[in-house]
Amino acid sequence: IIDNPEITLEANPDDLSEEKIVQLAASSINRLSIGIQSFFEEDLKLMNRAHNAAEAEKSLQLARQHFDNISIDLIYGMPNMSLARWKENIDKALGYGIPHISSYALTVEPKTALAKFVEKGLVSPASDEEAQEHFNLLNETLLDAGFDCYETSNFGKPGYYSKNNSAYWQQKKYIGIGPSAHSFDGVRRGWNINNNPKYIKSIEQE
């Protein structure tokens, strides 16, 4: 293992109680990646997220007290998301002093609640043009705030680029721990099963 490795924990806002964050800060974990996705209740409900808008903000308030290196995920291209509301999402993140943001266009996955809404005509996915406008606004706003777009979907302030994200493009080795986590040994890529109980059972058997 290299000296001073980046050890990132990925979590959702509803996973991060104050007690849990204090425990994480006392461990070897030195980077938090939080799946905020949106600061708006209607977006979170549409994506069927387990957390609400209040929990999203609370998790960042707590995380900032104990971690310096924090990344959040934000989703753009949401149905009915205006540029103004998307800008509010970005501004909220910047207001918390987050040094790294990963942002992805919404993908409507089969058999999800959102897919059913689309099938029934209750919502319409954003057009490619609308999603592009969202990304352009994100890129412009974050560059003005001192971020660099160092990888397609990742923006970081100098010194806060994700070593893990950079490793993908540089073909470096990395280890993923946990359900669905991917690893690369320099030759082959592999990934763990995505079922939590089965993953835990497999560890206990080893």
Each language-model region and where it sits:
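C-terminal scaffold of the Radical SAM
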Residues: 1-206
